[in-house]
Amino acid sequence: MMSDEEILVAYFGGKPQWSGNKLYKIGDMRVEYSGTKLYKVGGARIEYSGNKLYKINGERVEWSGNKVYKIGSKRF
């Protein structure tokens, strides 16, 4: 299973930069956290349903078991 951070790096496609064990930037976009959960990447809002990613920038995250199948129209 990919971590939320790995999913976002694959979705946005930039070079990840880490600060300790937290993702700090993807390309030029700054990553923001609310507590321990991801909140924003650049201007794109990250939403959760329970403990799973639900939406990225308004695009729905579709799961097949423990793996992300699709985000919006982009397949993984």
Question: Model-flagged regions — what are they?
Answer:
Residues 1-76:
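Repetitive, compositionally biased segments used for assembly/scaffolding
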